[in-house]
């Protein structure tokens, strides 16, 4: 998720890009004049608006196709056997001029690894919105999550672009965006199979998180949806799907305000919902404004919910109760994991920005975030004996550097873990000014027990996207395996997929070279070959060839 831009040279400071956000009522011309540059030397007008996510290295890719046997530098271990699914925010038609970077159409890029060979396939998720706009060859949907700005003919359509995450569950590849329910996609062909694959489970929610969590010990998927009963409602549903996709738990709670609840964390018994300091407002939407506005008066808030009806409750808790806890105004962006301490408290780790990391959703007064805002990685502590609405203590800063997209060895999800992998900015290798995707030019491997951190530097004018972790074997020790991440080579205008052995983290053991640039992913996941049934080739296979006998050394007939 592209959120932070133009980092400074200090390891402790993270600057935010502050684009001009015009007032909703201001008319916008049908075409935009792009600044003169090498790509547009004649300063030609375009229906594509000038925006940070639609220019430079974030130029829309809009590609569908496949590449067999990508060029590999180095050697890929045969144990890496499966598919890296990633989804990009890639608008197919020129979007509404005032729309935001997180609302482009979902485009999947899949990389299948087998016996050291990597095949690639790209295809759009054919959402209802994508098909309507592709048929019309123009934008029909207006602002993000604001149907009042959509063309009247499509207001009854699902406006999800399914562009945020891809998760395999119950043998279904789910394309997710939290504004709606999942789309199901074929894991081999990438064809879109349908909307709401769990409809038969009877959960009366309009939404499904882009960050469901897998409990590897119970083989369950923990799900939530906010604004579950409609726009700007306070209703939040939490539920659990078993390995066959059957609902086994369901609990409804209320959010303290209509907050942006993007991510969560799970422990053995608890679900922690992370509320960002944005607020939805129906009246603002009806006037043509954005769904979200940052509120500097709101605290970062964490809703703690029992995962099951059978969850042992602390003293003072009632059956069906949830509690929320507050800190200061900030944005805990993505979680790594959470666990239950021996002291009875809950602990959760996340990346954190000390201001609004989505400046395209400013407060109603239009204020932009502080350009010197810090970013770091923090550990939060929750004492469940405290009443709802209590303020929690300041979190422990685990890594005091700009960072994002933390991942763990997810075989240990719900338990206290040792290793964290995440994108970081390495200032010793550059000033960060030439990077535009958060300036995150490296990866970190941090040990929570020893506090040791190892770094992988991607190179000058490169930026790194969200990492994934692949265990060396199903029973290997925690953190023993490989980390994989897409690296954008900004000057060359193309991308590489790097493979790093965690036993020697500072260098890649293999680089998969893409012959072109593709859009930055929002999120992605690794699906091992053993986790799917009947996996086919991702790309077109050659039929059996019979030798013709007409080669240069063969006699004339």
UniProtKB/Swiss-Prot annotation:
Q: Where is this region: Disordered?
A: 1-46
Natural source organism = Botryotinia fuckeliana (strain B05.10)
The family this protein is said to belong to? Belongs to the carotenoid oxygenase family.
Residues given in the record as Fe cation binding sites:
211, 262, 334, 523
InterPro entries in alphabetical order? Carotenoid_Oase (IPR004294)
Encoded by which gene? rco1
Which residues are piceatannol-binding? Answer: 144, 177, 404
Task: Please tell me where trans-resveratrol binds in this chain.
Answer: 144, 177, 404
Q: Kind of enzyme, top EC level?
A: oxidoreductase
Q: Which GO terms describe its molecular function?
A: carotenoid dioxygenase activity; metal ion binding
Q: Name one Pfam family in it.
A: RPE65
Catalytically driven reaction(s): trans-resveratrol + O2 = 3,5-dihydroxybenzaldehyde + 4-hydroxybenzaldehyde; piceatannol + O2 = 3,5-dihydroxybenzaldehyde + 3,4-dihydroxybenzaldehyde
Function according to Swiss-Prot or TrEMBL: Dioxygenase that cleaves the interphenyl C-alpha-C-beta double bond of resveratrol to yield 3,5-dihydroxybenzaldehyde and 4-hydroxybenzaldehyde. Also cleaves piceatannol, a compound that differs from resveratrol only in the occurrence of an additional hydroxyl group, which leads to the production of 3,4-dihydroxybenzaldehyde and 3,5-hydroxybenzaldehyde.
| Superkingdom in the source lineage | Eukaryota
Q: What is this protein called?
A: Resveratrol cleavage oxygenase 1
């Amino acid at each position: 998720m592209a959120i932070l831009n133009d980092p400074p040279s200090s390891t402790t400071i993270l600057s935010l890009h502050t684009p001009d956000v015009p007032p909703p009522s201001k008319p916008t011309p049908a075409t935009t004049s792009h600044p003169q540059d090498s790509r547009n030397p004649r300063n030609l007008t375009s229906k594509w608006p000038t925006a940070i996510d639609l220019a430079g290295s974030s130029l829309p890719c809009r590609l569908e196709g496949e590449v067999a046997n990508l060029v590999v530098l180095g050697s890929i271990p045969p144990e890496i056997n499966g598919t890296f699914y990633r989804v990009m925010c890639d608008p197919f038609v020129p979007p509404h001029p005032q729309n935001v970077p997180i609302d482009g159409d979902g485009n999947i890029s899949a990389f299948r690894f087998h016996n050291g060979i990597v095949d690639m396939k790209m295809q759009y998720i054919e959402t209802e919105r994508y098909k309507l706009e592709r048929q019309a060859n123009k934008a029909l949907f207006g602002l993000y999550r604001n149907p009042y700005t959509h063309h009247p003919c499509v207001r009854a359509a699902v406006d999800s672009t399914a562009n945020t995450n891809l998760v395999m569950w119950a043998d279904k590849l789910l394309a997710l965006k939290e504004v709606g329910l999942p789309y199901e996609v074929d894991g081999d062909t990438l064809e879109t199979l349908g909307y709401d694959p769990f409809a038969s489970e009877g959960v009366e929610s309009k939404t499904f998180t882009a960050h469901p969590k897998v409990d590897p010990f119970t083989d369950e998927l923990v799900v939530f949806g906010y604004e579950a009963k409609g726009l700007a409602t306070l209703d939040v549903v939490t539920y659990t799907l078993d390995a066959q996709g059957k609902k086994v738990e369901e609990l409804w709670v209320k959010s303290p305000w209509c907050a942006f609840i993007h991510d969560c964390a799970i422990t053995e018994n608890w679900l922690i919902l992370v509320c960002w300091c944005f607020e939805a407002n129906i009246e603002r939407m009806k006037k043509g404004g954005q769904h979200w506005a940052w509120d500097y008066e709101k605290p970062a808030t964490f809703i703690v919910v029992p995962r099951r009806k059978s969850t042992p409750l602390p003293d003072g808790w009632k059956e069906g109760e949830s509690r929320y806890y507050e800190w200061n105004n900030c944005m805990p962006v993505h979680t790594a994991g959470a666990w239950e301490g021996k002291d009875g408290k809950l602990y959760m780790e996340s990346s954190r920005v000390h201001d609004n990391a989505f400046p395209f959703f400013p407060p109603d007064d239009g204020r932009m975030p502080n350009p010197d805002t810090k970013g770091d990685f923090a550990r939060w502590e929750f004492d469940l004996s405290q009443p709802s609405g209590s303020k929690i203590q300041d979190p422990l800063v685990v890594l005091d550097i700009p960072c994002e997209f933390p991942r763990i060895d997810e075989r240990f999800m719900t338990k206290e873990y040792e290793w964290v992998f995440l994108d970081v900015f390495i200032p010793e290798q550059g000033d960060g000014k030439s990077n535009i995707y958060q300036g995150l030019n490296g990866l970190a491997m941090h040990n929570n027990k020893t506090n040791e951190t190892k770094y992988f530097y991607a190179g000058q004018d490169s930026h790194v996207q969200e990492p994934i972790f692949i265990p060396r074997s199903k029973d290997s020790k925690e953190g023993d395996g490989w980390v994989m991440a897409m690296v954008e080579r900004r000057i060359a205008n193309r991308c590489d997929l790097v493979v790093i052995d965690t036993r020697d983290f500072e260098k890649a053991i293999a680089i998969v070279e893409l012959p072109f640039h593709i859009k930055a992913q929002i999120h992605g996941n690794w699906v091992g070959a053993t986790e799917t049934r009947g996996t086919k080739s991702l790309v077109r296979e050659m039929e059996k060839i019979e030798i013709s006998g007409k080669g240069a050394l063969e006699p004339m007939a």
